[in-house]
């Protein structure tokens, strides 16, 4: 059964991909596996895995440089940056400057053909501009997110350090695999730790 998953189920669980929040939206109901006694909603990892397979095939159809990945969230910044390095996609870790996709006068103006949003709520500016220019939106969504304007939702813990690293690592591997740049998933030798934001303890 483990073979059905892109990574062993234990790896998803160890990274906390399934850990949601204590809030849920009607939109996300279909992705929720159960609610714990403490009120925390748990995501269905099988659905996460299925959506990652679909997203990998979908994103592989685009020219690498026409894909944009964004994350305002701190723990998503290293995964997004590494994802860009590995796949050739454009990455904007940190603050998303208003007008980046809509105003040619902005310094780093860029018109992507598809965008990957780490959190629709935190990345609201990028989301707004993607809607404005009418490009497909692939979004990592947690139990409290809305799916309005999201074309392809990947249900996951979109706040956790290890969860975000694993999701972007799998997505990068799937894109390379579906592009034919690697002939098997085992050929992808970059460790998931390279996608992980490091905690600096003072």
UniProtKB/Swiss-Prot annotation:
The keyword Ribosomal protein applies. The keyword Transmembrane does not apply. Gene3D superfamilies: Glucose-6-phosphate isomerase like protein, domain 1. Pfam families: Ribosomal_S2. One of its GO terms (molecular function) is structural constituent of ribosome. One of its GO terms (cellular component) is small ribosomal subunit. Transmembrane segments: none annotated. Disulfide bonds: none annotated. Keywords: Ribonucleoprotein, Ribosomal protein. InterPro entries: Ribosomal_uS2, Ribosomal_uS2_arc, Ribosomal_uS2_CS, Ribosomal_uS2_euk/arc, Ribosomal_uS2_flav_dom_sf. GO terms for biological process: translation. SUPFAM superfamilies: Ribosomal protein S2 (SSF52313). It comes from the Archaea. Belongs to the universal ribosomal protein uS2 family. This is Small ribosomal subunit protein uS2. It comes from Pyrococcus horikoshii (strain ATCC 700860 / DSM 12428 / JCM 9974 / NBRC 100139 / OT-3). The lineage of its organism: Archaea, Methanobacteriati, Methanobacteriota, Thermococci, Thermococcales.
């Amino acid at each position: 059964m483990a073979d059905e998953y892109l990574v062993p189920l234990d790896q998803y669980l160890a990274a906390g991909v399934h850990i949601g929040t204590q809030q849920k939206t009607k939109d996300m109901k279909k992705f929720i596996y159960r609610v714990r006694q403490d009120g925390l909603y748990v995501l269905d990892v099988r659905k996460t895995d299925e959506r990652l397979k679909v997203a990998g095939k979908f994103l592989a159809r685009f020219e690498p440089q026409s894909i944009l990945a964004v994350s305002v969230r701190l723990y998503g910044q290293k995964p997004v940056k590494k994802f860009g390095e590995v796949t050739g996609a454009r990455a904007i870790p940190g603050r998303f400057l208003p007008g980046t996709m809509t105003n040619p006068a902005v310094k780093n103006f860029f018109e992507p053909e598809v965008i990957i949003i780490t959190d629709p709520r935190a990345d609201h500016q990028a989301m707004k501009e993607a809607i404005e220019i009418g490009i497909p939106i692939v979004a990592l969504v947690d139990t409290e997110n809305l799916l309005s304007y999201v074309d392809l939702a990947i249900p996951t813990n979109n706040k956790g350090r290890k969860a975000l690293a694993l999701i972007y690592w799998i997505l990068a591997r799937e894109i390379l695999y579906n592009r034919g740049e690697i002939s098997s998933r085992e050929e992808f030798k970059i460790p998931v730790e390279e996608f992980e934001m490091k905690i600096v303890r003072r």
